Amino acid sequence: MAKKVEKLVKLQIPAGKATPAPPVGPALGQAGINIMGFTKEFNARTADQAGMIIPVVISVYEDKSFTFITKTPPAAVLLKKAAGVEKGSGTPNKTKVATVTRAQVQKIAETKMPDLNAASLEAAMLMIEGTARSMGFTVTD
Protein backbone atom coordinates (compact mmCIF):
# COMPACT_ATOMS: atom_id res chain seq x y z
CA MET A 1 0.00 0.00 0.00
CA ALA A 2 1.27 3.49 -0.84
CA LYS A 3 2.26 5.80 1.98
CA LYS A 4 -0.24 8.53 2.77
CA VAL A 5 0.94 12.13 2.34
CA GLU A 6 0.37 14.05 5.57
CA LYS A 7 1.69 17.47 4.55
CA LEU A 8 3.12 19.41 1.61
CA VAL A 9 5.78 22.03 2.35
CA LYS A 10 6.76 24.52 -0.36
CA LEU A 11 9.98 26.51 0.01
CA GLN A 12 12.35 28.56 -2.14
CA ILE A 13 15.94 27.93 -1.09
CA PRO A 14 19.26 29.08 -2.62
CA ALA A 15 20.83 26.10 -4.42
CA GLY A 16 23.39 24.21 -2.35
CA LYS A 17 22.85 26.50 0.66
CA ALA A 18 20.07 24.88 2.68
CA THR A 19 20.84 25.18 6.41
CA PRO A 20 18.88 24.31 9.57
CA ALA A 21 18.72 28.06 10.33
CA PRO A 22 15.51 30.03 9.72
CA PRO A 23 13.50 30.04 7.51
CA VAL A 24 14.25 26.43 6.45
CA GLY A 25 14.66 24.83 9.89
CA PRO A 26 11.40 26.01 11.49
CA ALA A 27 9.33 25.16 8.39
CA LEU A 28 10.73 21.63 8.31
CA GLY A 29 10.59 21.19 12.08
CA GLN A 30 6.87 21.99 12.19
CA ALA A 31 6.29 19.30 9.57
CA GLY A 32 8.34 16.79 11.58
CA ILE A 33 11.02 16.31 8.91
CA ASN A 34 14.60 15.27 9.69
CA ILE A 35 16.16 18.68 9.03
CA MET A 36 19.77 17.52 8.60
CA GLY A 37 18.69 14.71 6.28
CA PHE A 38 16.80 17.14 4.07
CA THR A 39 19.51 19.83 3.99
CA LYS A 40 22.24 17.33 3.05
CA GLU A 41 20.15 15.74 0.30
CA PHE A 42 18.96 19.12 -1.07
CA ASN A 43 22.47 20.58 -1.11
CA ALA A 44 23.82 17.49 -2.89
CA ARG A 45 21.05 17.59 -5.52
CA THR A 46 21.36 21.32 -6.24
CA ALA A 47 25.14 21.81 -5.98
CA ASP A 48 25.46 22.28 -9.76
CA GLN A 49 22.97 25.20 -9.77
CA ALA A 50 24.86 27.46 -7.36
CA GLY A 51 23.63 31.04 -7.16
CA MET A 52 20.06 30.21 -8.17
CA ILE A 53 16.96 30.11 -5.98
CA ILE A 54 15.35 26.69 -6.30
CA PRO A 55 11.67 26.10 -5.45
CA VAL A 56 11.16 22.76 -3.71
CA VAL A 57 7.98 20.84 -2.86
CA ILE A 58 8.44 18.45 0.07
CA SER A 59 5.91 15.64 0.60
CA VAL A 60 5.82 14.52 4.24
CA TYR A 61 4.32 11.09 4.89
CA GLU A 62 2.53 9.79 8.00
CA ASP A 63 5.66 7.94 9.18
CA LYS A 64 7.59 11.28 8.99
CA SER A 65 9.62 10.15 5.98
CA PHE A 66 9.74 12.59 3.08
CA THR A 67 10.43 13.01 -0.61
CA PHE A 68 10.99 16.25 -2.46
CA ILE A 69 10.83 17.59 -5.98
CA THR A 70 13.00 20.50 -7.11
CA LYS A 71 11.57 22.83 -9.73
CA THR A 72 13.24 25.23 -12.15
CA PRO A 73 14.26 28.64 -10.77
CA PRO A 74 11.57 31.36 -10.90
CA ALA A 75 11.35 33.27 -14.20
CA ALA A 76 12.11 36.54 -12.39
CA VAL A 77 15.43 35.16 -11.09
CA LEU A 78 16.42 33.90 -14.54
CA LEU A 79 15.47 37.25 -16.12
CA LYS A 80 17.49 39.24 -13.57
CA LYS A 81 20.50 37.02 -14.23
CA ALA A 82 20.12 37.39 -18.02
CA ALA A 83 19.79 41.18 -17.76
CA GLY A 84 22.55 41.48 -15.16
CA VAL A 85 20.54 43.50 -12.63
CA GLU A 86 19.93 43.07 -8.90
CA LYS A 87 16.20 43.79 -8.90
CA GLY A 88 13.35 44.89 -11.13
CA SER A 89 11.79 48.34 -11.35
CA GLY A 90 9.62 49.68 -8.55
CA THR A 91 7.46 51.40 -11.17
CA PRO A 92 7.64 49.15 -14.25
CA ASN A 93 5.13 51.22 -16.24
CA LYS A 94 7.32 54.36 -15.94
CA THR A 95 10.90 53.28 -15.27
CA LYS A 96 12.60 50.64 -17.42
CA VAL A 97 15.67 49.17 -15.70
CA ALA A 98 17.03 46.66 -18.24
CA THR A 99 16.68 45.12 -21.67
CA VAL A 100 16.46 41.44 -22.59
CA THR A 101 16.52 40.01 -26.11
CA ARG A 102 14.06 37.51 -27.59
CA ALA A 103 16.92 34.97 -27.74
CA GLN A 104 17.40 35.31 -23.96
CA VAL A 105 13.64 35.00 -23.42
CA GLN A 106 13.58 31.86 -25.60
CA LYS A 107 16.43 30.29 -23.60
CA ILE A 108 14.63 31.04 -20.32
CA ALA A 109 11.35 29.66 -21.73
CA GLU A 110 13.13 26.43 -22.75
CA THR A 111 14.55 26.12 -19.22
CA LYS A 112 11.15 26.78 -17.59
CA MET A 113 9.10 24.64 -20.00
CA PRO A 114 8.72 21.60 -17.64
CA ASP A 115 7.15 23.82 -14.93
CA LEU A 116 4.96 26.03 -17.14
CA ASN A 117 1.49 25.04 -18.25
CA ALA A 118 2.18 26.19 -21.79
CA ALA A 119 1.31 24.11 -24.84
CA SER A 120 4.15 25.44 -26.98
CA LEU A 121 7.46 27.24 -26.71
CA GLU A 122 5.85 30.39 -28.19
CA ALA A 123 3.23 30.42 -25.40
CA ALA A 124 5.99 29.96 -22.80
CA MET A 125 7.94 32.84 -24.36
CA LEU A 126 4.88 35.10 -24.08
CA MET A 127 4.59 34.23 -20.37
CA ILE A 128 8.28 35.05 -19.78
CA GLU A 129 7.95 38.31 -21.77
CA GLY A 130 4.99 39.29 -19.58
CA THR A 131 7.05 38.63 -16.46
CA ALA A 132 9.89 40.72 -17.93
CA ARG A 133 7.55 43.64 -18.69
CA SER A 134 6.06 43.53 -15.19
CA MET A 135 9.60 43.79 -13.79
CA GLY A 136 10.35 46.92 -15.83
CA PHE A 137 12.43 45.19 -18.52
CA THR A 138 12.21 46.01 -22.22
CA VAL A 139 12.06 43.03 -24.61
CA THR A 140 13.86 43.64 -27.92
CA ASP A 141 14.45 41.61 -31.07
Curated annotation (Swiss-Prot):
Keywords associated with the record: Methylation, Ribonucleoprotein, Ribosomal protein, RNA-binding, rRNA-binding
Gene Ontology MF terms in the entry: large ribosomal subunit rRNA binding; structural constituent of ribosome
Gene Ontology CC terms, in alphabetical order: cytosolic large ribosomal subunit
Signal peptide: none
Entry superkingdom: Bacteria
Entry annotated with the keyword Ribonucleoprotein: yes
CDD domains (UniProt xref): Ribosomal_L11
An individual GO BP term: translation
Modification note: One or more lysine residues are methylated.
Oligomer and partners: Part of the ribosomal stalk of the 50S ribosomal subunit. Interacts with L10 and the large rRNA to form the base of the stalk. L10 forms an elongated spine to which L12 dimers bind in a sequential fashion forming a multimeric L10(L12)X complex.
Function: Forms part of the ribosomal stalk which helps the ribosome interact with GTP-bound translation factors.
Family membership noted in the UniProt record: Belongs to the universal ribosomal protein uL11 family.
Protein name listed in UniProt: Large ribosomal subunit protein uL11
Native source organism of the sequence: Streptococcus suis (strain 05ZYH33)
